[in-house]
Amino acid sequence: MSEKMVAIMKTKPGYGAELVEVDVPKPGPGEVLIKVLATSICGTDLHIYEWNEWAQSRIKPPQIMGHEVAGEVVEIGPGVEGIEVGDYVSVETHIVCGKCYACRRGQYHVCQNTKIFGVDTDGVFAEYAVVPAQNIWKNPKSIPPEYATLQEPLGNAVDTVLAGPISGKSVLITGAGPLGLLGIAVAKASGAYPVIVSEPSDFRRELAKKVGADYVINPFEEDVVKEVMDITDGNGVDVFLEFSGAPKALEQGLQAVTPAGRVSLLGLYPGKVTIDFNNLIIFKALTIYGITGRHLWETWYTVSRLLQSGKLNLDPIITHKYKGFDKYEEAFELMRAGKTGKVVFMLK
């Protein structure tokens, strides 16, 4: 193994990132070193690249970016048990304390002292990465790296879609970005019908149809609530899944969901949102779930089994694959323009 590696690094505050050569890190106690086989770009990585207000408050350059990964364990630090060199793995990004009130109740996904791998630590946009052993997930060999790297965001989609009954339910999904597209795949694999998708981008509406959406709506040109009511014989959808983070989409979805329906919210909003709580939530007796992270480790088992079932239609979602990191700037600019689904760097 070489002593040097290439990595995409946020070297300083400001727009962009740099491809640099750095030392291969060494795993410390309770850590493992993985060789990266595939890694994918998340919206969080784009925020760091663009250096938005959140990134400015959270990221401390110089730092290697990236957190979605499939890799192979190549070295084990002191005190690590249950993991071996050669294991094919992915990484849960929430580094939890195990001691706070939430953790002691088994609610690790809302740990009060969470650190995020690849946000608060160096990440996986590199040939090698050091990972806390407690965050390692072992993959079946049958799952290819370009799918295995998607398990972390797939976990977000699974928790959103499967927060309540979904088989045989009518569903409205607002937002067909990468997470929304994964939500479509999970909903279809889980027996939802019809799956209706509201998305303003022509490119993403086409992707939504390829993934399996039964109906697509352009919210800039069509009345979303009217279209949903027409499709559902005036009843509204059983389940509303909000992936966009757009306040208008939230309002439309709450109007379009049937009384006593279920709502799952994953999209993050730009600020405070004004909602008619009385008429859109209370009098409709809606059940609402806020979604963050993934349930450790229940969601990972669900994601892995869905992948092994072969029922998830992920190929249309992976719109761009790059061999190595050389074209990382092109990849990020395409994502900024909304011209991608998931972008994967292949290092195998």
Swiss-Prot record:
Cellular compartments annotated: Cytoplasm
CDD domains tied to this protein: TDH
Source species, domain of life: Archaea
Listed pathway(s): Amino-acid degradation; L-threonine degradation via oxydo-reductase pathway; glycine from L-threonine: step 1/2
One of the record's GO molecular function terms: NAD+ binding
Thermal effects: Optimum temperature is 70 degrees Celsius. Extremely thermostable, the activity is not lost after incubation at 100 degrees Celsius for 20 minutes.
Activity-pH behavior: Optimum pH is around 10. Below and above pH 10, the marked decrease of activity is observed: the relative activities are 50, 22 and 55% at pH 9.5, 9.2 and 12, respectively. Is stable over a wide pH range: upon heating at 50 degrees Celsius for 20 minutes, the enzyme does not lose activity at pH 4.5-10.0.
Broad class of where this protein is predominantly found: cytoplasm
Binding-site residues, Zn(2+) 1: 42, 67-68
Annotated site, Important for catalytic activity for the proton relay mechanism but does not participate directly in the coordination of zinc atom, chain positions: 152
Function: Catalyzes the NAD(+)-dependent oxidation of L-threonine to 2-amino-3-ketobutyrate. Is much less efficient when using NADP(+) instead of NAD(+). To a lesser extent, also catalyzes the oxidation of L-serine and DL-threo-3-phenylserine, but not that of L-allo-threonine, D-threonine and D-allo-threonine and many other L-amino acids.
Further comment: The enzyme shows pro-R stereospecificity for hydrogen transfer at the C4 position of the nicotinamide moiety of NADH.
Pfam families linked to this entry: ADH_N, ADH_zinc_N
Cofactor(s) this protein requires: Zn(2+)
Xref: HAMAP family: Thr_dehydrog
One GO-annotated biological process of the protein: L-threonine catabolic process to glycine
Cofactor: binding details: Binds 2 Zn(2+) ions per subunit. Contains one structural ion and one catalytic ion that seems to be less tightly bound at the site. Zn(2+) can be replaced by Mn(2+) or Co(2+) to some extent.
Effect of residue 152 to C: 120-fold decrease in catalytic efficiency
Residues involved in NAD(+) binding: 179, 199, 204, 266-268, 291-292
NCBIfam families: PRK05396.1, tdh
Enzyme class at the top of the EC tree: oxidoreductase
Taxonomic source organism: Pyrococcus horikoshii (strain ATCC 700860 / DSM 12428 / JCM 9974 / NBRC 100139 / OT-3)
PANTHER family cross-referenced by the UniProt entry: L-THREONINE 3-DEHYDROGENASE
Designated name of the protein: L-threonine 3-dehydrogenase
Enzyme Commission numbers on file: 1.1.1.103
